[in-house]
Amino acid sequence: MKSERFSLDANILFYAVDRASGQKHAIATRIAARSLDADCILTLQALTEFFAAITRKKKMSASEAAHLVRNWMSIYPVVPPTEGTLNAALQLVTTGRASIWDATLIACLQANDCHYLLSEDMRTGSRLGEVEIVNPFMGSLPRALEHLLSDDE
């Protein structure tokens, strides 16, 4: 079964490289590895948030983190915000549905036909526009994303 397009939030990227994160590291590593053969996109925002978090918490040097971000940019399609996504984000914010940062992330995903955001920072199961938030650390994934955690290779 072909999965629908999804994206990884900065925290999933963080846990994928932070070996001290225990079970979250194991889950995020599996998701990251399996996302390579799936319809996964990354946002410019998630990459910059990852860089800021991983270097602020001194888990990597700026040079190491930059190398990793550049590597991901060569592997995954990376979607930047645009004037149109900012307008869509402002609509979400003014209706009280999200912060400007979450709204910008969601608007970028929505503009790129992305149906799921894997993140632990937003309420799992909630839907902002066409994007469903999924926390992979809270149990099961939607059917379209089950292959990311299944035992099947």
Spans of features found by a protein language model:
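Acidic catalytic patch
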Residues: 44-48, 74-95
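Conserved glycosyltransferase catalytic-site signature
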Residues: 10, 102-103
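Short, well-structured N-terminal submotif of metal-dependent ribonuclease cores
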Residues: 1-42, 57-64, 140-146, 150-153
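Acidic, metal-binding active-site segment of PIN/NYN-like and related structure-specific nucleases
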Residues: 103-145
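Amphipathic alpha-helical interaction segments
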Residues: 45, 49, 67, 88, ...
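Active-site-proximal, substrate-binding regions of enzyme catalytic domains
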Residues: 49-77
